[in-house]
Amino acid sequence: MSTWTGKRVAVLYGGRSSEREVSLRTGAACADALRQKGHDVVLLDVDLEVAARLRAERVEVAFVALHGRFGEDGSIQGLLESMAIPYTGSGVLASAMGMDKTVSKAIFRSLGLAVADYRVFPRASAGSIGVGDLPFGLPCVVKPAGEGSSVGVHLVNEAAELGPACRDAASHAGDVIVERYVKGTEVDVAVLDGKALGAIEIVPANAFYDYAAKYTAGTTKYFYPARLPEAHVRAVMEAAEAAHRGIGCSGVTRVDFIVAGDGTPYILEVNTLPGMTATSLVPKIAAGLGLSFPDLCERILDGAALKA
């Protein structure tokens, strides 16, 4: 029997971030899965009245299915802490650090994890960034520091592409990060309660795993387990666990890497609230271990707690 059987569960989804549509899909899928397990579930689209709605619904535990700003950055976690409502996923500080790529990259380096060379630029200077500002040259990857789901991320191969890419990244949350492009195999690792579940290999139809490739069915191929030498898989899973611990995460995370030809796992980011849609990677990895989607959602729910 689940820890929260018989309790009123709110699945928090939607919200105001650029990842709202993905969150709506995640929340709907998770709510349906929890209902299949017999839980009393209410879906709440997070808005400025969410605190009053949580009280009105007499919510006893929250399943956080939000992505991006105001949901994955510690904001909703702080509200739930102040209302003494246990919730799934990471706490306020870990969520904030995981969301801010500038902060998380510094932490990864302090842990001894491999991080591709990068530069951070204020949003105000985005229009003046040139190739001469990049000691690692081209190709490079441009991204906003405070977004997820590859929102505002660009692969830049030519100098003429750099300015538009930086200006677009600056239109999103956070500073502009420009990092050296690492050629290799894209691999994501699911971590649940501090333990790596497995590593999945991602092969997009195009050269870059962007927003469309992530959320459009049929545009990307996945291989589980990842088609890498055993030693490389072991290294990437150990790095994922170290990143999960180093940020101070709880519950389930997805840690993204590029594994170079020599087996070095270059960490990209930790997703403290990974997608849980039909095309999402954590459910794919769990399914490969024989863990059904409803069982996975209940495992995540069982870990709900106050973290402050």
Curated annotation (Swiss-Prot):
Pathway it acts in?
A: Cell wall biogenesis; peptidoglycan biosynthesis
User: What is known about what this protein does?
Assistant: Cell wall formation.
Organism for this UniProt entry: Anaeromyxobacter sp. (strain K)
The family annotation for this protein states: Belongs to the D-alanine--D-alanine ligase family.
The primary gene name is ddl
Cysteine pairs bridged by disulfides in the record = none
Q: Write down the required cofactor(s).
A: Mg(2+); Mn(2+)
ATP-grasp domain segment(s)? 105-302
Assigned GO CC terms = cytoplasm
> What's in the keyword line of the UniProt record?
ATP-binding, Cell shape, Cell wall biogenesis/degradation, Cytoplasm, Ligase, Magnesium, Manganese, Metal-binding, Nucleotide-binding, Peptidoglycan synthesis
Cellular localisation: Cytoplasm
**Which reaction does this enzyme catalyse, per its entry?**
2 D-alanine + ATP = D-alanyl-D-alanine + ADP + phosphate + H(+)
Cofactor, how bound (note): Binds 2 magnesium or manganese ions per subunit.
**Matches recorded under HAMAP family:** Dala_Dala_lig
- Positions binding ATP in this chain are 133-188
Residues binding Mg(2+) 1, per UniProt: D256, E269
- Does the record's keyword annotation contain Phosphoprotein? no
Q: Which PANTHER family match?
A: D-ALANINE--D-ALANINE LIGASE, D-ALANINE--D-ALANINE LIGASE B
By its UniProt entry, which PROSITE patterns does this protein fall under? ATP_GRASP (PS50975), DALA_DALA_LIGASE_1 (PS00843), DALA_DALA_LIGASE_2 (PS00844)
Key word Ligase present in the record?
yes
Query: Which SUPFAM superfamilies does the protein's record reference?
Result: Glutathione synthetase ATP-binding domain-like, PreATP-grasp domain
Where is this protein primarily located?
A: cytoplasm
Q: Which domain of life is it from?
A: Bacteria
EC no. given is 6.3.2.4
Q: What is this protein called?
A: D-alanine--D-alanine ligase
The UniProt annotation places Mg(2+) 2 binding at E269, N271
